[in-house]
């Protein structure tokens, strides 16, 4: 499920906005997605749920027509991510929808502190909140500083009968230093107190709290706070996966924070799942970069439970050390040769079924489905050579006996590395990325040693 960015127009100027690279301004012109292109994207992303985003999606001149098209599809559901300052046309349209249609639209109202609105904007927001079925609405807000007064969120939920709240931790636009409002080393702990207090207060009022973007790492909380928070459903999350934003021209990016470094185009992919997997694989390379010194030896990082905070902070941390750092060596032959491959034995299994047969397969996230990979001698030799200490270029030299010449060795070994990477079985160590060696069971280690 992707976010369809139907417009880059927005009628607010939020202090924590991370969409500044695409938002229309004096240098970037308005881009309202044409209806024909909107329909094409719906074919590319044919999920049962479609997310409409911006900018502010309701500023699109064809917004209501887009809703009508989606509602005409049997079984289609819609999420609208909005600031709620709707025009009278949009408000009347939504208020007038029959229940059979309105129940298929969910609204996430991202709201600011009351003193950040003009009187007109505030009246529009309250009118929008009053126009929707509270059961289909979330109130969302972003914590971008501390101390942070969230009492207005609880009051707004009470006033409009909305029971579900989503919170985010502000994430910077990596090219806009004005958005660097949070320093992980200094601010994560204080922000964790804000999150904890908010969740406890909301829970006491019977509200459902859902985490959104910008998760904090477990180490930001005290053990006592974590114990309390783990009892609150749906609970905390310490990592994220690609949702994928798709805009005009088929331009797609993993998320707004990573807009400038992780982009693609829908024309190069078979569908939304293919595109999402492309981004998710490369996400792991960013997650391997340490934000804090403590991350290097962290068991939560080892297990994949925690990324250490928003991935944009990983990028910033790397650029502070090397402005020319290559984040995705898997896509660059020269960088790949210099990297150190690490196998992920939570995903990859090497099973010596018998003295004459070794089976190599992958199974992700405790799924029932497996995929069998190659088990020829050179592939098994490559797996054994990936010891987390040896660079790719040295592995190629060590496996030279299997090939006719160095060019063939280089091409084949890099192809094997990319095969394992595409199956979520390979991490790449670099000067700034330190994927930890996964713990192996005795049987797995024994199988690895006998290769």
Language model segments and positions:
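Canonical Radical SAM [4Fe-4S] cluster-binding loop centered on the CxxxCxxC motif
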Residues: 1-33, 44-45
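Cysteine-cluster motifs in flexible loop/terminal segments that predominantly coordinate metals
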Residues: 17, 285-334
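Radical SAM/AdoMet-radical enzyme domain recognition
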Residues: 35-53, 60-188
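C-terminal accessory region of radical SAM enzymes
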Residues: 190-225, 251-307
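Short, small/polar residue-rich loop motifs at catalytic or cofactor-binding pockets
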Residues: 233-241
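Long, charge-rich, low-complexity alpha-helical segments
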Residues: 297, 370-451
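Hydrophobic packing positions characteristic
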Residues: 327-355
